[in-house]
Amino acid sequence: MKLIILTGLALLLIVSLIDVEAQNEGACLPRGSVCTTNHASCCSKLSCDCYRRFEKGVEKGQKCWCIPTGLRYSKEKE
């Protein structure tokens, strides 16, 4: 009986470790990827930077990308 319980626990541990490894593999978004405001989704040394888009004075939504931390884009003067 103890052998069956220990075998079951060992299998559960192995399955859990495989699942955690699969979640960690490719879990972050690379530079230039579209992200949400969740900063944890971008890879290390990247942050999720968002800006609001306007067309002819009307807001067209918010766009977010993973960019290097500290990098800022600004509108080019026309």
From Swiss-Prot:
InterPro entries: Spider_toxin_CSTX_knottin
Entry keyword set: Disulfide bond, Secreted, Signal, Toxin
Tissue expression profile of the protein: Expressed by the venom gland.
A GO-annotated cellular component: extracellular region
Subcellular location: Secreted
Domain of life: Eukaryota
Removed propeptide positions: 23-26
GO molecular function, one term: toxin activity
Signal peptide: 1-22
Pfam families: Toxin_35
Post-translational events: Contains 4 disulfide bonds.
Family to which the UniProt record says this protein belongs: Belongs to the neurotoxin 19 (CSTX) family. 07 (U7-Lctx) subfamily.
Protein name: U7-lycotoxin-Ls1e
